[in-house]
Every structure is written in C-alpha cells, then in structure tokens.
Amino acid sequence: MTAPRVALVHERFTEYGGSEAVVAEFIKTWPGAAVFAPIVSREGHDSLVAAVASGRRGAPAHDGAADDAAGQGISIHDSWLSRAHAAIGGGAHAPLLPFVPRTLRRLPLAERFDVVVVSHHAFATQAVFATDAPVIAYVHSPARWAWDGAFRAQEAGGKPGQLALAGLGHFARRAELRAAPRLAHVIANSHAVADGVRDWWGLPATVVNPPVRIDRFTPDPSIPREDFFLFAGRLVPYKRADLAIRAVQRAGGRLVVLGDGRHRQYLETIAGSETTFLGAAPDHVLLDMYRRCRAVLMPGVEDFGIVPVEAMACGAPVLAVAAGGALDTVRPGRTGEYVEFGDDTAVVEGMACLIRDFDPSRYDPAAISRHAGTFAPTAFRARIGDVVARAAG
C-alpha cells in the first residue's frame, strides 16, 4: 500500500517548546512529510531538525527555509513573514500575527497531499482553506487569550496591551470559528482543551496527550529527597509562580524557582529568604532538582503541562490545582495531590496546607515514574498515527 502524502502545518518555528516537540514527533510518525510554517527563524529551524534527528541517525543541516534537510526527508517551507521577523530583530512575533491567517490560507497544499495535519494554537486551522484534502487539527489550545477574558487581562500587562490583545482576540475567534466546520477531525492535547473545543468551537475532540521526553529524566534512588519544594517553568503570569511563593511563605517552607521570564522581577519583589531563584538552567540542573525536591508545585492552570510529567519521571510527586492538564497527569494519592481550584487566596491556603503536612515517604517513586512512562513519545506516535489514519479514512 502506498504511504499517504502528509503535510504538517505549524504556526511558527521561532523557539522550541512543547508544541514544537509535538511536530517533531509528527515528523517521526510520518517520515518525509512536508512541514509548513509562516514564520521560521534559523534557531527555530535548527531546534526542530535537532529534535527529529535525536530519534534517528544523522542530523540534517540548514540550507534555507525551504529545503530537503540533508536527505532526512524533512522539507520545511516558510513565507515572507520569516524575512519580516528577521528584519524586526527576530524577537517578538506578535506584530506579525495579523498576517498569519492569510498566509496560511495561501499555502501550496492543493492536490499535493492526501491528508493535512495542523498543529494549532491560534491560526493554523486556516490551512483548511488551502486544500480539499482532509484536515485534522491537533489542538494545543484554542486561542486561550482570545476566548478567555480573564486570561487575556492577566497576560496583556496594562491597558494598551489589553486593547491590542482584545482586538487580536476578536480576529482570532472569527478565524477559528470560520475554519472549525471544515475540519475533518479535532484532536485535543488534554481533556481540558477538549472541553474548550466543545464550548468554543462546538465540536467533539479525541484526546491524545502530547509526548514528553521522559528518557532525559529518570529517578535515582541513591539521592535523598531534601527539604525544599520546586517550581519549574517560564516565569510568565499565567504559570502563577507567585502563588507558589506565597504558599511556601504561608507554610514556612523553602522554595527553589527554576526558570526565567518577564515576570521574574515582580516575583523577586514578593519573595523572601525562603525562595531561591536559579534562573534558566540546562537539563542536568533540572534533573538534579527533580531528583532532590520534596515535590513540584503547579499552581497555574495549564492546557497540558510538561513539567509535572518530567518531575514524575524522576519519581517526584506533584502538587497541582485540580484544573486544566493536571487532571490528565496527576493521580491523587499515587503521584501527587490536588489543590481545589478557586480564587488566589483559596489556592494559596490549600497549597500551604499540603506543603505543611507533606510526607514524601507516602509515595512510591518507582510507581510515579512508571505512570510518567505512559506519556512517552513512542506511546504518542502510536496513538496519533492510529487516530489520524481512522479520521482520514
């Protein structure tokens, strides 16, 4: 049987994160698939190529934004927006977002592919207008800043930012609703995202949790758990590191914050001697922290959340709010505990109570690590391949 011709559409390759890791696994699932993204930076391109190469022999080289990457079957196609992104310094991509939907609607997909798989945050589903082939959307989240007013206000940072994001949000909602009826199938990365797809798009979704590179994170029983809790991740408002800091202060504990971002300066003003900021750090430092902390704190609501799974792969329990992607990953009494979701005061008090009474000896690190194994890339590739094959008919 002839292998299907698959196109993969992502919104941008300007940095490497969880959604780019998903695309890397897409490429391993469908070798030779063409990859399209309106905005591609050199760093973003090279990070994707390295991630794909890590799962097979040979590392493809960079020959421009539209290339067949060193015989590895990866062709990455961008647009004029890549050059515009470089011209404005290669930093923030937000000024280019209004041009992304039109660019996606003009992708050269017609009559070239049997199925198109899009990796969607806000605009990728616009590719549905560029082809008559079945389009299957893997949704990291419907544009949360577009649909959720509270989230938008939290992220915008001041009145001018709120106005700009409100306008862009209206634009994104219209784009998503226009594309949704034409999708052949929707796959959500968590049950919380599936609920958003149902409520905002009016569509059902199959849940396939994203892959987590747990091979990089393993337990070490010879390393004892120490007397500190860990927050790891980008220091941006919605991650709610501020709640972790306040909860540890309330409980009289110690906290290590691993990560960096625009919210760090504010966080340092509310933290005291109980909190240590390590900044951004390589994997070996993160691994060491996962192995030594009493537990990882997850006070923010994530669409999925990679950090809890990485921590559990190292045998570390996770204390998380009972909302969002944590409902897919944390098992109370086995791999961690939930804090009842509520306002900031309730979350801080609930997490402080867990911290005060927390006893890591109640949890089996080996069982926690085995649970994390269910999110391994091999499991993801098997599930996504099966779901797409059935949806594409």
Residue map of PLM features:
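Short hydrophobic beta-strand element within catalytic cores of glycosyltransferases
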Residues: 297, 317-322, 330
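Acidic donor-binding loop of glycosyltransferase active sites
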Residues: 291-303, 316
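Membrane-proximal helix-turn-helix segments that form the acceptor-binding/catalytic region
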Residues: 154-186, 194-195
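Conserved acidic donor-binding segment of nucleotide-sugar-dependent glycosyltransferases
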Residues: 279, 332-333, 337-346, 354-362
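Active-site donor-binding segments of glycosyltransferases and PAPS-dependent sulfotransferases
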Residues: 29-125
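Conserved donor-binding/catalytic core segment of Leloir-type glycosyltransferases
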Residues: 220-256
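A charged, aromatic-enriched C-terminal amphipathic alpha-helix characteristic of glycosyltransferases
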Residues: 98, 342, 359-389
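Nucleotide-activated donor-binding/catalytic signature segment of Leloir-type glycosyltransferases, i.e.
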Residues: 265-288
